Amino acid sequence: GEVGRTLSADDYDLERLFDRDGCQILHISGLIAALSPETTDCCLKVARRAKQSGTRVCFDLNHRASFWKGREAELRAAFHEIASLADVLVGNEEDFQLALGVEGPEAGGSGIYGKTDAFKHMIGRVRALYPDASAFATTLREVYSANCHGWGAILLAGDTWHMEPLREIQIMDRIGGGDAFARAA
């Protein structure tokens, strides 16, 4: 809500988190980074501080067009900087295209499993832009019906590709599925 729009890096004891407590990994959601100019600044400052302390950064792009409206240039620059600090980049095909401007396969649709090479090429382009990251993950989702999807994933970790083939899953509520994937990546 509205309180979340006012998050500031000053709200957190970054020295304690990163230096004294030894936070091992920082996860940043693109939803929070795009929520308001204040949260964008917060995410940038926290990501910079994490890297300064040697903490790994995971960035889930999580692009939402409504959050970007009227702030496209500002957010593209901020997302580029956070991505350049990230050790792990997570996003679906739309996230990589819309948040980072990386060419990728057509979003959604059927026959997604047959397009895995296009997803790998997209990840390769992301890796070329952000060579300091060590892992890149994307979901593969094919919608069969409102309550039934095929869901899989592709991960490039170092130089090794990992792929989880599409599995048919029953959908009770779509909210949070991508977030759960990003946290596990």
Regions found by a protein language model. Give the residues of each.
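Conserved phosphate-binding/catalytic loop of the ribokinase/pfkB sugar-kinase fold
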Residues: 1-41
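Structural motif
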Residues: 25-27, 58, 90, 137
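Surface-exposed cleft-lining segments at the edges of enzyme active sites
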Residues: 29-36, 64-67, 109-111
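Surface-exposed amphipathic alpha-helices with a cationic face
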Residues: 44-51, 127
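Short, small-residue alpha-helix embedded
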Residues: 172-185
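Short beta-strand/loop segments at the ligand-binding rim of alpha/beta enzyme cores
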Residues: 54-62
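Conserved phosphate/ATP/ADP-binding segment of small-molecule kinases
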Residues: 53, 66-159
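Glycine/charged-rich beta-loop-alpha catalytic/anionic-binding loops adjacent to active sites
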Residues: 28, 159-170
